[in-house]
Amino acid sequence: MKKIRCLKSFLIAAIPLFALSCSTLKDFGLSPSINFQNVAINSLDLEGITFNCDYSIQNPYPLSFSVKQVSADVLYENTKFTSLSADKGVSVAALGTKNNSFTFKIPYSTILNFSKSASGKKSLPFAISGNASIDLSKIPLMENQTATLPFKKSFEVPVFKPEISLSNPKIVLPSLSEMKNAFTSGGMTVAAAAVAASSILSGSKVSSDIFDNVNMNLKCNFDLNVANSGSAAWKFILKNCSVKTSKNSSAALVDLSAAAKSNTEITSSSGTIPLTATLNTLNAGKFVAQILNKSGENPVFSVESGLSFPELSYAAELPLSYSKEIPLSSFKVSKK
């Protein structure tokens, strides 16, 4: 072993002086190499799964070289699904290692289509196969040479497609006496408070400022519906929910995360998480008036969740976001 190391050192030092061929260097193990480390889920959205591929390229030479291109085919059962290329012009330092990665996306529609012939499998066998082309023109005596470093890595793709929707938005009005008390406490006369409360309970249109200076709480209920169209075992975890008065609002009007603490996980193929938020008219009065009038900008409902696949070795609680405008016309108004 010691002799081989000495011989390598001698050959490297002698490159500028002796006519050594590329094959001679390779005979002594002096050739670039690629280490394709893993394929992992990078992110999820409602369209597909984005995978991340980590790899490194080792340079055994005392001069840097560049990567002409990393190209690969994504395969399903040895049939090409898609091709990709990356890293043209990336430099690898002398006697160094370059760590890098690239991503690709597999749509849920493709996964479910492939699964039709997979006899109910919970995951599908994919592979990524390709090579890295290395430009050796900066290495003495290798000016016209290119090294090709092949790689192949298998990975499992869960058979699933998440579906998230919101249903049954409803605002629950306080009783007549509670509203009258809130209005009078806010400065209205008893007669005016009675008229305002009766008008709201009867479903009449209200002015946008009817709740100004009025301290009153109203319950706002939603159903968050979650489903998995595939056969993979999964776990959906609700992390956070919020509602904004419009899509351009900078801050959440209501934080619903605390309202669902007792029921935030779904492990079956589908399920519903009931959510209840409290709207206080001191800071949400105009929004409540919009709901009652069914007129104005639609609020935006957002969900932050985590997904995991217990039967696969992917990271737990992969983040998945969902955002949807709620038409004001879809809100129901009910009484206590």
Predicted features and spans:
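Bacterial N-terminal signal peptides that target proteins for export
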Residues: 2-11
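C-terminal motif of bacterial Sec signal peptides marking the signal peptidase cleavage site
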Residues: 19-21
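Short, solvent-exposed beta-strand/turn "edge" segments of beta-rich domains on protein surfaces
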Residues: 25, 38-50, 58-65, 91-94, ...
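N-terminal beta-strand/beta-hairpin edge segment
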Residues: 39-41, 51-122, 130-132, 222, ...
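Solvent-exposed beta-strand/coil patches in large extracellular/periplasmic or lumenal scaffold regions
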Residues: 68-70, 174-265, 271-274
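Intrinsically disordered, low-complexity Pro/Gly/Ser/Thr-rich segments with frequent PxxP/GP/PP motifs
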Residues: 79-113, 247-286
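Terminal connector regions
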Residues: 108-160, 281-333
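Surface-exposed beta-loop interaction hotspot
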Residues: 141-201
